[in-house]
């Protein structure tokens, strides 16, 4: 009867599960066509739309432009498409083409820092019809097949450009070749310098146009706070300003005691955005294109680049002494989270910013001025030219939707739309900030006299001297590649390890650039010699074969470990389906869920490791090349080493302390509830708040909470804490040694030494100043033991402290909850054990070593496995929030994340993920073997 009921129940459960999947699935589409009773509605999905609820003038103008497009669309449709659609119903469908309207929808999706949102949408088949494109990611999007060419003659979008002539004056075509947009429209919208960015070879080797700018060109200028310049008696910058003038002004303004800094710079993987202006002004280039070979090459390793890096490093980290005798570093603020607020408060003297061609700026000209970027040492000015761009998604299936999407792109900056936006901005009080040429174009020439003096001229200089943001092969990675030498050079200067002479220092800078330029050419361009490629393939094949063999033995061992022993002297039982049928049936839903949502995706995704995987285009088989590249990739192995460091710190600081805390809370004679509440309180704070709070604690100036504390502790304090911990560890080691437990004794000695070195290292800046000979430092140690730290610590950017700084917030927030399970387990230890230990004369340490730890051994082991795996699993998110991988904290998981979702290298990222799994599987099997022998029993109830 039971079996019959079971046979009926299980199929019913699967049917309900299937129906639930059907009803909960909500397949989102991009654009589509709706047949209303008396009209046809074309729905268009756009990556973003202006918010109609935002009352600011600029947004109201943008909203008005969108509304005008929806109002005028029926006229455009009737003029350009209605008759064509009626004539070809097989291609365009049977719809009411006499009454058509359009509805726009803002694309939605998960927003993840560091990841292109539209990339996630494309991967999930939810891409908008109109994509946002910028210069640096344009090549990746073009070569990946994300963009639809806009100059197909049959479409009539841009028209036929095959015979077009493009020069410094713009584009020109013969009348017979026109079609689509006119030359006048194109020249009004597209700056001649932008044509190489949007018109180039695609994935099939054909030169086509892939995107169209909107909003006008963007030029980089130098903005400055007039109030700060006046406060420090500095003449305002001019068009003739040089690097020396910039440095002199930054030095005069910088006053960390008041929170004033000369120049705003930044950190993170794209810090080189700030440096690239100096690179171009010095005469250097990021990458160059050879039309004969149709190839790109990274070239930021020249002597000019070294000069730019040297100047930038001095701005960032040069050592100087303020009026109070305190050591300071650099003349810039690089705190990304606070820079915007500091600029608004008037605490930063200068910053680089973009100026829009149409709306020059909305800053207060009474407080903020702007000039072109300073001239370099050779008299060159290297501003940046950029532009926002729109492109059509290549997988728009319905040509009607694609035509409607193009009309949106075309109208966005059409003369009619720009005229309306200009009118609204003039009426809203922004007229004086509009480029005078548009004021004259639309009849507002009388407002031109109100425009801030020189702004239009400076914009023209920025465009004339500007170079397009890197747009070459895989240029989405360019900023990250150029940031590596910047970070290394800064750290060398912070550690006082750079030569004092200009020639020697430039040589060091040049060597850094050569090293990382070579890495950029390998990772971005793929420059690997045939001989090296052959070597990599051979090594990768050998390693993969070894892994397969190892996996075979590992899974065989797992099978043996978890096979139930036979009864008596019989053989081990295998599956025993008949005996355990009910148990197997109950496990089926859970097993199927794990199979469907874990193992099948893993197996399907694993094939990506052997391909140059493309989301839309056909992927190319590369064999073991991805594995060969990562085996010879220093950056990958550095990330693995960082992951090991992070895991060790997590185990040392978040696994063991809760055990110690639980013992103390158990033994404290009074106030147990109060202490437990105090230690548990941090757990009620959300993770994001914890991160933000600790990032404020880590502020690199003396105003940071942690620095304010550390600056008032003498060197002997750090050494004393380390020495105290060493003594405690040695006390434990001594008791273990007396009981002939030598392995444990050695472990405690090693832990004590590490704790001593770790805490004592905080005194290194006091005891061993940078640039001083070791002998001199040793002679001065007795006197320096009572000295204080000479300067604030840069906790999250200093490679020596960044990793542990990422772990400390976890310790603070996790110790309280982590000790609860041990407190519960300690309650299960019978009092008889402690009494027997007292009778035997056991000390407090003896009770911990020979009563507590043996009783908690199984629990500690289980938690250790979870803590170890969790340290690898959670490292990516924690590091991303705290440092973004800066300060030599990029762990393996974060490295894989950037490789896949920022650089679109899915094949190499998958190979890295598998390699990481291979490394961890041995540890996991070893722990499974131990856990298979653990016997669990309920704790005995105390009387």
Predicted segments with their positions:
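C-terminal capping/gating helix-and-loop segments adjacent to ligand/active sites or protein-protein/ligand interfaces
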Residues: 449-527
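Glycine-centered hinge/linker elements that transmit conformational signals in sensory
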Residues: 247-252, 290-333
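C-terminal lobe and pocket-closing loops
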Residues: 357-365, 377-483
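A structural signal for multi-pass alpha-helical bundles of membrane permease subunits
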Residues: 582-943
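Conserved N-terminal structural module of periplasmic/extracytoplasmic solute-binding proteins
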Residues: 11, 28-146, 496-545, 551, ...
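Extracytoplasmic/periplasmic solute-binding protein
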Residues: 197-222, 245-297
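Short, solvent-exposed loop/beta-turn-alpha elements that line the ligand-binding surface or hinge
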Residues: 151-189, 239, 284-307, 375-383
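Hinge/lid segment of periplasmic solute-binding proteins
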Residues: 135-219, 369-371
């Amino acid at each position: 009867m039971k079996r019959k009921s079971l046979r009926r129940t299980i199929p019913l459960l699967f049917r309900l599960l299937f129906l639930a999947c059907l009803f909960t699935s909500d397949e989102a589409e991009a654009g589509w066509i709706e047949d209303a009773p008396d009209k046809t509605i074309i729905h268009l999905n756009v990556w973003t739309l202006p918010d109609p609820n935002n009352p600011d003038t600029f947004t109201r103008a943008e909203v008005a432009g969108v509304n005008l497009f929806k109002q005028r669309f029926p006229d455009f449709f009737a003029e350009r498409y209605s008759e064509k659609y009626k004539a070809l119903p097989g291609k365009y469908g049977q719809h009411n083409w006499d009454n058509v309207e359009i509805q726009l929808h803002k694309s939605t999706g998960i927003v993840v820092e560091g990841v292109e949102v539209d990339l996630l949408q494309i991967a999930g088949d939810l891409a908008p019809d109109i994509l946002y494109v910028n210069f640096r990611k344009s090549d990746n999007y073009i070569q990946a097949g994300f963009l639809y060419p806009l100059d197909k003659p049959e479409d009539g979008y841009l028209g036929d450009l095959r015979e077009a002539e493009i020069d410094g004056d713009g584009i020109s075509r013969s009348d017979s070749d026109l079609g689509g947009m006119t030359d006048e429209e194109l020249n009004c919208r597209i700056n001649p310098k932008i044509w190489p960015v949007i018109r180039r070879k695609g994935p099939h080797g054909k030169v086509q146009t892939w995107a169209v700018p909107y909003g006008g060109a963007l030029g980089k200028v130098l903005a400055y706070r007039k109030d700060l310049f006046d406060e420090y008696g500095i003449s305002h910058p001019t068009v003739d300003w040089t690097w020396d003038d910039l440095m002199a002004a930054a030095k005069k303004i910088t006053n960390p005691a008041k929170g004033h800094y000369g120049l705003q710079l930044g950190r993170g993987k794209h810090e080189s955005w700030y440096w690239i202006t100096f690179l171009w002004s010095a005469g250097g280039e990021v990458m160059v294109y050879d039309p004969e070979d149709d190839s790109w090459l990274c070239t930021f390793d020249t002597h000019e680049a070294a000069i730019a890096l040297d100047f930038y490093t001095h701005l960032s980290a040069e050592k100087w002494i303020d009026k109070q005798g305190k050591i300071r570093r650099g003349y810039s603020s690089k705190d990304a989270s606070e820079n915007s607020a500091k600029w608004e408060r008037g605490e930063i003297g200068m910053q680089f910013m973009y100026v829009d061609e149409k709306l020059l700026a909305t800053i207060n000209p009474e407080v903020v001025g702007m000039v072109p970027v300073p001239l370099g040492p050779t008299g060159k000015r290297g501003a940046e030219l950029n532009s926002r761009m729109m492109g059509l998604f290549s997988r728009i299936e319905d040509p009607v939707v694609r035509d409607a999407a193009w009309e949106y792109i075309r109208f966005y900056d059409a003369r009619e739309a720009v005229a309306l936006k200009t009118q609204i901005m003039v009426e809203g009080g922004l007229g004086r900030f509009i480029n005078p040429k548009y004021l004259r174009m639309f009849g507002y020439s009388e407002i031109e006299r109100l425009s801030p003096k020189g702004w239009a001229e400076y914009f023209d200089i920025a465009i004339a001297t500007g170079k397009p943001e890197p747009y070459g092969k895989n240029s989405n990675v360019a900023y990250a590649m150029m940031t590596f030498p910047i970070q290394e050079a800064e750290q060398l200067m912070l550690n006082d390890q750079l030569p004092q002479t200009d020639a020697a220092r430039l040589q060091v800078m040049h060597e850094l650039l050569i090293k990382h330029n070579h890495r950029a050419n390998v990772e971005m361009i793929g420059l690997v010699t045939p001989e090296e490629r052959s070597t990599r393939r051979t090594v990768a094949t050998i390693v993969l074969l070894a892994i397969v063999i190892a996996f075979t033995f590992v899974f065989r061992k797992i099978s043996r470990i978890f096979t139930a022993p036979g009864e008596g002297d019989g053989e081990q039982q295998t599956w025993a389906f008949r005996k355990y049928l009910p148990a197997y049936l109950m496990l089926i839903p859970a097993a199927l869920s794990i199979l469907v949502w874990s193992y099948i995706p893993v197996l399907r995704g694993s094939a990506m490791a052997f391909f140059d995987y493309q989301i839309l285009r056909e992927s190319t088989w590369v064999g073991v090349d991805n594995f060969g590249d990562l085996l010879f990739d220093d950056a990958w192995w550095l990330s693995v080493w960082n992951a090991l460091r992070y895991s060790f710190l997590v185990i040392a600081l978040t696994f063991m302390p809760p055990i110690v805390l639980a013992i103390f809370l158990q033994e404290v004679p009074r106030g147990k509830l109060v202490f437990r509440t105090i230690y548990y309180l941090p757990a009620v704070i959300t993770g994001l708040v914890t991160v933000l709070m600790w990032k404020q604690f880590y502020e690199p100036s003396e105003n940071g909470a942690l620095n304010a504390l550390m600056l008032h502790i003498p060197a002997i304090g750090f050494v004393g804490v380390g020495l105290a911990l060493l003594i405690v560890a040695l006390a434990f080691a001594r008791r273990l040694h007396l009981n002939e437990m030598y392995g444990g004794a050695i472990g405690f000695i090693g832990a004590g030494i590490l704790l001593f070195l770790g805490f004592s290292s905080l005194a290194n800046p006091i005891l061993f100043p940078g640039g001083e000979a070791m002998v001199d430092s040793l002679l001065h140690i007795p006197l320096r033991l009572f000295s204080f730290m000479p300067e604030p610590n840069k906790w999250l950017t200093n490679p020596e402290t960044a990793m542990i700084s990422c772990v400390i917030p976890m310790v603070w927030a996790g110790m309280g909850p982590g000790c609860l399970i041990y407190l519960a387990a300690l309650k299960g230890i019978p009092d008889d054990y402690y009494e027997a230990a007292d009778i035997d004369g056991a000390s407090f340490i003896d009770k911990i070593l020979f009563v507590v730890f043996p009783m908690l051994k199984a629990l500690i082991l289980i938690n250790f496995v979870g803590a170890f795996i969790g340290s690898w699993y959670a490292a990516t998110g924690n590091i991303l929030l705290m440092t973004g991988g800066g300060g030599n904290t990029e762990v393996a998981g974060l490295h894989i994340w950037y490789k896949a979702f920022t650089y679109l290298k899915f094949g190499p990222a998958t190979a890295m993920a598998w390699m990481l799994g291979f490394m961890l599987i041995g540890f996991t099997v070893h722990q499974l073997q131990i856990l298979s022998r653990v016997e669990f029993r309920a704790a005995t109830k105390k009387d």
